[in-house]
């Protein structure tokens, strides 16, 4: 991919990109995708959503550990809306923790940081965390 080529050409040897893949650690796997929030009938949005669901599915299915932690850019749950396609996949695959970004500033006050249908969701955008990294899990 373009990103992997850029990383390699610039000698960034501590950065890896999730792309239809996962990273396996001792006892858990990190999975993810950009995700999407489908709230329109536009054909383009449906196409992007379907592609992102397939990417996330590939990422989760590539994981070797039972515990899988998912990271998304877009929130699958926001205010009184949710992205049922992403949520259904997370439930189908037994995901218990999902971290997401995208929401900044005033939009972050509407973030969903709670359990929804058996999955714990948490907004981890940099400004929400006051630019202090959040320890997800020690390994």
List each language-model region with its residue ranges.
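Binuclear metal-dependent phosphoesterase catalytic core
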Residues: 24, 47, 88-94, 106-139
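Intrinsically disordered, low-complexity segments enriched in polar/charged residues with Gly/Pro
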Residues: 7-10, 99-100, 123
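Short amphipathic alpha-helical surface micro-motifs
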Residues: 12-15, 102-105, 118
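Conserved catalytic scaffold of divalent metal-dependent phosphoesterases
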Residues: 2-85, 89, 138
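The start of beta-strands in P-loop NTPase/AAA+ ATPase cores
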Residues: 68, 96-97
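Active-site environment of divalent metal-dependent phosphoester hydrolases
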Residues: 1-2, 22-24, 38-41, 75-81, ...
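Conserved beta-strand scaffold positions in the cores of enzyme catalytic domains, especially
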Residues: 17, 30, 98, 121-123
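A cross-family glycoside hydrolase active-site/sugar-binding cleft signature
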Residues: 71-73, 101, 124
